[in-house]
């Protein structure tokens, strides 16, 4: 059975009200996204450090899903009128029903990070039995190895991590970097995320990979410093978290930062150079990674 997907661009004053109204009048689902997602103007909002707790993007997309025979246009008209909106433009497309599990699995093949490091979904055979294989399935938390920022951090761990070092993965998402660190020789690794779902996903993924990783919400992170601190998040929280991440890094320890665009590397480098001697930025597909040693 096909579905109707409707996308409406609105401002921050009405996005949540419109999503609620669409659900009340029959939408199967309604989601709110940054209208500028994937561009330089993308904003880190929900739950990001340094951002107000109650805030939404100034320009948002409300994406609603309807059944094949639902009167989507009428529902949108009713919902927009309730929200005080008139003649609101929207776009629509048909989404074909599929075997979503099989489709999802077909889109995720093993990913080769380096000669010795692979990421392999659980439904695939391990491509290189002698390699370090991370068993990781796509889920609700960010980090499957397909994004350039994740790959940049994995490549650093693969080539620079020393046996027995302690690692803090701040903004751990799926826990991929925490797990990789342990499989690559770290003596101790901790993942931290503001999202409870990510913390649960990290624990599940660590169990699947037979590694003893610990995962916490920020308030639960024990005191202490680490040999290596990795933060693969967005530029705005990286700006806000510099002093804290530096404090968590041992003197002579190293930091690895990603989640920033190419053009943001110079600015972030200026901030973190207060505490670290930084190497030149490494880039991949428009994204950057900074790394350096704490003075």
Swiss-Prot record:
EC number: 2.1.1.-
Keywords: Cytoplasm, Methyltransferase, S-adenosyl-L-methionine, Transferase
Sequence similarity: Belongs to the methyltransferase superfamily. PrmA family.
Entry superkingdom: Bacteria
GO annotation, biological process: methylation
Sequence intervals crossing the membrane: none
Name of the gene: prmA
Pfam family, one: PrmA
Molecular function terms from GO: protein-lysine N-methyltransferase activity
Matching InterPro entries: Ribosomal_L11_MeTrfase_PrmA (IPR050078), Ribosomal_PrmA_MeTrfase (IPR004498), SAM-dependent_MTases_sf (IPR029063)
Class of enzymatic activity (EC top level): transferase
Signal peptide extent: none
Places the protein is found: Cytoplasm
Catalytic activity annotation: L-lysyl-[protein] + 3 S-adenosyl-L-methionine = N(6),N(6),N(6)-trimethyl-L-lysyl-[protein] + 3 S-adenosyl-L-homocysteine + 3 H(+)
Annotated function: Methylates ribosomal protein L11.
PANTHER family for this protein: ELECTRON TRANSFER FLAVOPROTEIN BETA SUBUNIT LYSINE METHYLTRANSFERASE (PTHR43648:SF1)
Chain positions recorded as S-adenosyl-L-methionine binding sites: 150, 171, 193, 232
Protein name in UniProt: Ribosomal protein L11 methyltransferase
